[in-house]
Amino acid sequence: MALYREGKAAMAADGTVTGTGTKWQSSLSLIRPGATIMFLSSPIQMAVVNKVVSDTEIKAITTNGAVVASTDYAILLSDSLTVDGLAQDVAETLRYYQSQETVIADAVEFFKEFDFESLQNLANQIKADSEASESSAAAAAASESKAKTSEDNAKSSENAAKNSEVAAETTRDQIQQIIDNAGDQSTLVVLAQPDGFDSIGRVSSFAALRNLKPKKSGQHVLLTSYYDGWAAENKMPTGGGEFISSIGTATDDGGYIAAGPGYYWTRVVNNNSFTAEDFGCKTTATPPPNFNVLPAELFDNTAMMQAAFNLAISKSFKLNLSTGTYYFESSDTLRITGPIHIEGRPGTVFYHNPSNKANPKTDAFMNISGCSMGRISSINCFSNSYLGKGINFDRSVGDNRKLVLEHVYVDTFRWGFYVGEPECINQIEFHSCRAQSNYFQGIFIESFKEGQQYGHSAPVHFFNTICNGNGPTSFALGATYKTTKNEYIKVMDSVNDVGCQAYFQGLSNVQYIGGQLSGHGSPRNTSLATITQCNSFIIYGTDLEDINGFTTDGTAITTDNIDTIESNYLKDISGAAIVVSSCLGFKIDSPHIFKINTLSTIKLMNNTYNYEIGGFTPDEALKYNVWDANGLATNRISGVIHPRLVNSQLGINSVAFDNMSNKLDVSSLIHNETSQIIGLIPSTGSNVPHTRIMWSNGAMYSSTDLNNGFRLNYLSNHNEPLTPMHLYNEFSVSEFGGSVTESNALDEIKYIFIQTTYANSGDGRFIIQALDASGSVLSSNWYSPQSFNSTFPISGFVRFDVPTGAKKIRYGFVNSANYTGSLRSHFMSGFAYNKRFFLKIYAVYNDLGRYGQFEPPYSVAIDRFRVGDNTTQMPSIPASSATDVAGVNEVINSLLASLKANGFMSS
């Protein structure tokens, strides 16, 4: 309906509309805020009237910054098309005419008292005077004419006044007839009553609605906005809508029900959908916040958002969230206790800044319990100081329906997505979600019952979900965090997990499809993902990126802050990209690998079986093993391995087995074409060909097993004159040693290579001696990490030349400068060119050292010595000999004599 189109109008970019030939404030123009002004330009531009300033100026909003030159226009009043809008227009018209009745009546009374007889007498006197004197005839005639004109004008004015009075009375009678014909309950009748606005019509705020008493049930009222003052703030009204009255009592929930004494109003919900603003929630346009600077307009939405959640659950309504930032200052948790559908927008942000940081270890920002089905989409959750859990899943209902999280982003909590109770998983799907920059794990999902060996949860599926940049900071294991105890350390038999990106325990039918597991920007973690006691776990097409391995010195973890972990467990702190422990059914295929700098890309351990590994696509050379099987029992080996690493740049090993059970039938373990293994090439610049397969302690039982499994197919058939075999082993304090099952006379071995993974100061020395059959020393040397030179470009290697006639090799790692700290980060290993040759890795602690010797053809004799309770240090190499290589034999012999004399070594 066009209300006004006189003149022309132009609009500036700030929404100022200027009129030419307009009278926008005239009484019957009916222009008011909310009307639509349409400019008949090309293209047509539209805006909403916010304020009528004058006859020639209007302030408009929602203009999109458009600039319109002076043109024809039309002002529309959209709500005139409704009964209530039409009623308001008619009422204003009626009030106008009623306001004019007094003016019209005054005019009528004036002309009623006008002295027409005196006017006539005056005319007659003028005529008589004219006849008496001809000289004044012309003047008299003129006077008579003027008098006659005045008489006629007066008569016309009287008639006009009469007509106006009749017209006003007729209009009033017609409008009254319309009102009378509409019936007693019409909007017009109610508006015409003195208390009409109080009974029905439009109310400005939810608070005012509570005080608006209806006359009976079933009355309607329009709520303009949840809060007053929206126009003054130059904002659009939010939270408004239609309400219906009821006589009785109900609980006021702050959005759906507005209750007063003996009555209440119920919101009309269209399409089973409502907004958080219907409950008084507010957003700001502030972008994702600076954690140290809070905006001045901070508004705590906790109670209102919880009420909105409750309505969505109880009525099965969809809750719509707006673009903008919702702030939450209360430490209370937002709780979802049933099926729910929440839909945000790409710019929807939840920012958690609790004033009372009660218990960050257990508190959650959002807790989902009893939610067997539903969908939560497009929410970005932030916290200001790594508080509690982002979204916590707690005791889901056990049926076959599922909960879907879609485009949900969790950032800067302690944990991102967290499930920490048994039997609370029920078909959860994560679609395009992200957990980033959380203090511990981005994804921590554990559905584990004591005594349950493998996962028993309902399916958990991840599709294109990103988990990156999470994990503890470099000081997270220090004394500052004594109160955290074991909250981020998980011990899995012989490996501990410190701050991985994602942790899964006790799950069934898990799929991680696409997406990313990455350590982007995070301090070093042990792994990207740790998977333990799961059943049927699949990783497919996922980016595995950017991890260096956690390198914190073992002294950072003490019994003061972690009182249930023995220090000797902390030995795998270089980690792996993916750690799989005690799983029944594991498959990883087609991952994209980039910047992986851990001991292993995939580490299988502790009775993991029914696994399949393959399809790797590395972007660059891997530093160490592609995958590593550690301690897999004989009856658990049923994997199929398809590396498909043709011409890929790998690290030291493509496949590594460590601590395998004896009598392993290795021929049934790897089902692969030879070409898929031997196409590997070493990293650029390396003079030493990389190992194809790495074995260690207990891996091979006899030469028959060795020949059947690998020797012919994988170590000797590549037409390379030198194919090294890398020997590697890890020790705990209580168990070390082993036997060599295949070796060759030392006079056939030309070189021994010694490697370290840590370049420390000269506090430690690796010593090595070559002895003849009588035990006489033929050659000896020692090496500090600083001695490792660039002779062989592989970082951390030195070469020891084996002299002719050598029958025994003695080696060890000893303290050389009364070092009282820990040397846990020292790892020593060795291999020999052309022949299979076994050495151990040694990690020397401040209270424990090892000294070993190798004597072909079939045994390794390992002796250990221990200095009790950290009170006595290992015998030190004299300072005068610390850099005197020529005196190494005397030093070693003196050291051996001291060790034997103190009972630390056998004879």
UniProtKB/Swiss-Prot annotation:
The residues forming the signal peptide are none
Q: Where in the cell is it found?
A: Virion
According to the record, the residues making up region (Disordered) are 137-169
Q: What ranges does the record list as Basic and acidic residues composition bias?
A: 145-155
- Keyword Transcription, does the record have it? no
The Gene Ontology biological process terms listed for this entry are: adhesion receptor-mediated virion attachment to host cell; symbiont entry into host cell via disruption of host cell envelope; symbiont entry into host cell via disruption of host cell glycocalyx
UniProt key word rRNA-binding: no
The record ties this protein, via Gene3D superfamilies, to: 6.10.140.1630
Location (main, coarse): virion
Q: Which UniProt keywords apply?
A: Degradation of host capsule during virus entry, Degradation of host cell envelope components during virus entry, Host-virus interaction, Viral attachment to host adhesion receptor, Viral attachment to host cell, Viral tail fiber protein, Viral tail protein, Virion, Virus entry into host cell
Family stated for the protein in its record: In the N-terminal section; belongs to the Webervirus depolymerase family.
Subunit field text: Homotrimer.
Record remark on domains = The N-terminus contains an extended triple helical bundle. The central part is a beta-helical domain, which forms a negatively charged cavity at the interface between neighboring monomers. This cavity may contain the active site. The C-terminus is formed by 3 four-stranded beta-sandwich folds.
Protein known as: Depolymerase, capsule K2-specific
